[in-house]
Amino acid sequence: MEHCDIAIVGAGMVGAATACLLAAQGLSVRVIETRLPESYDPAQPLDLRVSAISQASVALLEQAGAWQYLQQMRLCPYRRLETWELDGFATRFNAADLGLPQLGYIIENRLVQLALLKRMEDFPNIQTHTPAAVLSLRQSTDDVMLQLDDETTLSARWVLACDGAESHTRKLAGIGVSRFEYRQHCMLINIDTEFAQEDITWQQFTPSGPRAFLPLPGQHGSLVWYDSPARIRALAAMSNEALTAEVRRHFPARLGGFTVMAKGSFPLVRRHANDYHAGRVVLLGDAAHTINPLAGQGVNLGFKDVACWADLLHSAGTGWHKPELVTRYERRRRPDNLLMQSGMDLFYGAFSNEIGPLKLARNLALNMADKAGPLKEMALRYALGLV
């Protein structure tokens, strides 16, 4: 049997970031991953899966030592954010209002993962098992024993489940999850644009769902189209040429000239684990919670989990293995994750109907929010993870 301090299941963005931060504390780390991503080539088309990486997440990536590698690939800073339903009733945010150089960056998920995996190579105390998966786990008071499908038997003081929304580790640990399926699906559409993109991301609410635009490097962008499952299935079946015409009909004219290059779709599901731990198995990121992607906060919440767990272990010093740490972790992270989930659900519910008085009220609210001064700044700082 092999032994380590920390076993991390999943080498995605959350798992790889956790590995880097804990290895930097001198802990021995094993990372178990079924499949590594394709390596980066600047000639590759941009991936569909992107994230709006907040300033707090940038700071975490810098702390992990991965930001230097990301800067050698491709990313797109955004400095302004705008959201509206009716013309003239908009809320606008600007990095300059907070004295920041940008609100964050739009980055392909795979590139964030690759930068973190590259950083992992710098640590002699990180060992990766790939391709490998956990077949079983058995807990005792002081450790967890894992049986992997590469015939490795591994014991660890902590097992961190970072293996995503359908976490197999969570199931093996016997942790239940509450689940809610929204009445919408989401389509991601990568476009080539007529002109190089500016530093703004925007979102318009419509009766059938939001329409959003995220800038990507150069003359590229990402569109996000929320609609009924049947409508999204119909859009997914269209040729790129037909979809281009459909987007022109249903997105704001400010989008300008563009051509659809790639598309994909998925259902919208909110999940929240009933517990963030079972014994010495701890959930981080999507294994613990997923939210409506309206504000692009998914991975940022995951990185806040990572920062919290790393801080708890660091603060504990030689007591990093004590079982009471999991209670502190859940006490810190569950309320914040629940608040963000509830906030996204509030937006979803408020903007998903055509009741006249409510429509007027929500547009007035957007307009008032734009003029709210300190409250607006506080909300933005919270969304960016700066408070």
Locations of the language-model features?
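Conserved N-terminal helical subregion
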Residues: 2, 59-62, 73-172, 180-185
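Conserved Rossmann-like nucleotide-cofactor binding loop
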Residues: 14, 37, 166
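Glycine-rich FAD pyrophosphate-binding loop
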Residues: 23-46
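Conserved FAD-binding catalytic core of PHBH/FMO-like flavoproteins
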Residues: 61, 159-263
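FAD/FMN-dependent oxidoreductases across multiple families
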Residues: 231-321
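C-terminal helical "tail/cap" subdomain of flavin- and related membrane-associated enzymes
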Residues: 311-387
